[in-house]
Structures are given as C-alpha cells and as structure tokens.
C-alpha cells in the first residue's frame, strides 16, 4: 500500500465525535482501513417495504452511505467494505429516519465488539477436572458503529427514559456519520 501509514486511523482518532469510540484494541484493525467514501442513496439501495404494489416510486431516495474500504485480506474480518447507510426523511432539513450497517464477518476469535469472559466450571462429583467455561459479553468498540440503534415497532411501548435513550443514540449515530 502507498500513502501515509495509518492515515485513516489517525484521522478518525482526531475526529471529535469519533475519537471517543475508538478503543485501543480497535487500532490494529483500523490500521487496515484504506479509504472512506460517501455515496448518495440510489433507488437500488432502497427496498420500499411500504409500497408492495407495482407502482414505481420516481422520487430519488434521501440519504447517503459511508463506505469503509479495508485491506484484504486482513486478520480481523472477511469484509472488504463495511457500509453504514443513513435513510433520511427530508433533504431541506434532514431528519434521520433510520440507519443500517453491514454485518461484519469476523474471523474466529477476532470479534472486537465482544469480550470473552472465562470462568472455572464446577466439577460434578469430583470425577472430572474443571473445564474453563466461557461467555461473551458486548463491549465498547468503534466497530459497534456498524450496529446502529434499533427502532422498535410502532406497537412497542417505550417509557420516557427508553425513548430519550433511543433519541440520544440516534442523534449521536447521525452526528458521527455526518
């Protein structure tokens, strides 16, 4: 590869909104980031679930995609490009309707979004030696950016605190992407 080594890692580390989400363990994976590009949404990007009829929607979709291009192969995941898509309601005064991210195809044992907790399993009857048991737990990582906040169904009832947390998460998600 040509260019400045770890350019994108350095740029992301110096971005006010993003820097707080980059953990030390993310840095080796982000060192494989080669480019970040942005594209407007096209009709092919949008699956109109509300209009199941045969009518064509002539209106251009509102929103954009951020594409994170990674060196391949890399020792963390199989994806060459990780995408975050922002669907907007209005071009004039853009309002985030929802966002979606690429599912990352992590290589075995390399998922930076979880940590493996090891604990000693108890022996039954003292006959077998203890086997270490493991469980995974979500952890902070830049790569959680590709798993945006989920908007519950209209039927779901959220209390005021849950609604506020969802609103804050969506605002932060959009701030990072824009």
Predicted regions and their residues:
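Mixed-charge, low-complexity intrinsically disordered segments
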Residues: 2-178
